[in-house]
């Protein structure tokens, strides 16, 4: 063996021998700030013995002498105790409540003329700000521990996302994916400590920002939130695709204790809003002039949230010589607008927003707005045959004329019947008066019946 190697090995052995005896077999206990830790002290005999707990400065913390146990004058006086029920089993643990990071250090249990050392390491997980934060804000989580400690740290976020193994975790511009429970696992000397921190990102949930509608149909706007216990005020402002150059307010509202109350709203729109979460708006009719972009603003105590929403309206118009389909409002260039007759090939728009067919054939036509084969909007219109289309006005006039003639004839018949009854009644009245004036009446039964029959 090389003499230099032998000397190196001998030097290492001497270093190990010279280490303080108290450090050998030292028990390590990990604790969380604010909770309690139990430091073990086990005697070889399963019976109650005298014992004493001290810190590394030999200050007495807690012990038993004779039949009494008492606490020392340490800074832990109000936060320490022991489990008396375990003393008969030869166990004399030191329980420290409401742990603080400065409580970290070496504690010594003296029992049976021997010293048992326990190293306590207290850690705390702190956040740079409130863990309820707005979308886009930043947050840093920091693991605090005793100076000189170098534990293994592992961070894990929602969806088991793993992060760096440093003592701090930075989350710049938090998003919806960061909302949830974050776990910090601390490992030291085969001991493990787990911290959980729940982060709530106040934001709108992910929903489609564009609503598609056919002209005249009812439209619903929904704005689900990631929270429901914040009081706020809100406003939906709208910029029409063809109209004013500046946005105008459509509706204002407030949310207090989960109840929604409407402030001001445009009367001509006849907007309806749900009285509870999620935020829900109903537009009775989607008209072409309403197509455009809107912005919903929520005012919270922590700041503002914004959500953009677009309304795309499809309109189909027909004339004697053409059929036109168009969409109004903001659309993506990748969308395809097509017009086709059933069971025939499509006629695709070159402008993405308008397609026209001249001299459309009779039958059912479809106008489609699609995105990579997925139909977003569909409108159908029926084109009548040319002969029927030209004859339809005349046929309608004939039908209306016939109905009018029947009504006039019925009125004439009713009037004639009333006149005949009136004339008949007048003749009978005149005949009775004439008979009475000539005194041709009598009291015999057959004459009386005749007179009565005349009346």
UniProtKB/Swiss-Prot annotation:
Residues carrying a glycan: 46, 220, 231, 295, 299, 343
Transmembrane segments: 395-415
GO BP, one annotated term: cell adhesion
PTM annotation, UniProt: Palmitoylation and association with LCK contribute to the enrichment of CD4 in lipid rafts.
Modified residues (Phosphoserine): 430, 437, 453
Region described as Disordered: 145-165
One GO MF term: coreceptor activity
One GO CC term, this protein: cell surface
UniProt domain Ig-like V-type: residue ranges: 26-125
Assembly and binders: Forms disulfide-linked homodimers at the cell surface. Interacts with LCK. Interacts with PTK2/FAK1. Binds to P4HB/PDI. Interacts with IL16; this interaction induces a CD4-dependent signaling in lymphocytes. Interacts (via Ig-like V-type domain) with MHCII alpha chain (via alpha-2 domain) and beta chain (via beta-2 domain); this interaction increases the affinity of TCR for peptide-MHCII. CD4 oligomerization via Ig-like C2-type 2 and 3 domains appears to be required for stable binding to MHCII and adhesion between T cells and APCs.
Name of protein: T-cell surface glycoprotein CD4
């Amino acid at each position: 063996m090389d003499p230099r190697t032998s000397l190196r090995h001998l030097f290492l052995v001497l270093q190990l021998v010279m280490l303080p005896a108290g450090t050998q077999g030292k028990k390590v206990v990990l604790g969380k700030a604010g909770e309690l830790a139990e430091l073990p002290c086990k005697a070889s005999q399963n019976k109650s013995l005298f014992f004493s707990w001290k810190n590394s400065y030999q200050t007495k913390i807690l012990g038993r002498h004779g039949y009494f146990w008492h606490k020392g004058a340490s800074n832990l006086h109000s936060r320490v105790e022991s489990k008396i029920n375990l003393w008969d089993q030869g166990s004399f643990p030191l329980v420290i409540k409401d742990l603080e990071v400065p409580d970290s250090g070496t504690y010594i249990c003296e029992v049976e003329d021997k010293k048992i050392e326990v190293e306590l390491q207290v850690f705390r997980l702190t956040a740079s700000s409130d863990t309820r934060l707005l979308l886009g804000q930043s947050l840093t989580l920091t693991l605090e521990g005793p100076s000189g400690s170098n534990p293994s740290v592992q961070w894990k976020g929602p969806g088991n996302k793993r992060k760096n193994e440093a003592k701090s975790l930075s989350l710049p511009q938090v998003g919806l994916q960061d909302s949830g429970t974050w776990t910090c696992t601390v490992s030291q000397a085969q001991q493990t400590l787990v911290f959980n921190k729940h982060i709530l990102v106040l934001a709108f949930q992910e929903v489609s920002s564009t609503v598609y509608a056919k002209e005249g149909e009812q439209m619903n706007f929904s704005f689900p939130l990631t929270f429901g216990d914040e009081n706020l005020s809100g406003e939906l402002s709208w910029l029409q695709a063809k109209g004013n150059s500046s946005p105008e307010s459509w509706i204002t509202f407030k949310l207090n204790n989960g109840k929604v109350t409407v402030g001001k709203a445009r009367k001509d729109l006849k907007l309806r809003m749900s009285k509870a979460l999620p935020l829900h708006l109903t537009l009775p009719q989607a008209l072409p002039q309403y197509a455009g972009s809107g912005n919903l603003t929520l005012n919270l105590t922590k700041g503002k949230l914004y959500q953009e929403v677009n309304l795309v309206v499809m309109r189909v118009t027909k004339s004697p010589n053409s059929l036109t389909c168009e969409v109004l409002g903001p659309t993506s260039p990748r969308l395809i607008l097509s017009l086709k007759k059933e069971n025939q090939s499509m006629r695709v728009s070159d402008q993405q927003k308008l397609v026209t067919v001249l001299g459309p054939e009779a039958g059912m036509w479809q106008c489609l707005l699609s995105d990579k084969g997925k139909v977003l909007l569909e409108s159908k219109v029926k084109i009548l045959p040319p002969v029927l289309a030209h004859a339809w006005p005349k046929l309608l006039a004939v039908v209306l004329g016939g109905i009018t003639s029947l009504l006039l004839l019925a009125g004439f018949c009713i009037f004639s019947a009333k006149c005949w009854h009136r004339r008949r009644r007048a003749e009978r009245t005149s005949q009775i008066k004439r008979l009475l004036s000539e005194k041709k009446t009598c009291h015999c039964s057959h004459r009386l019946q005749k007179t009565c029959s005349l009346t």
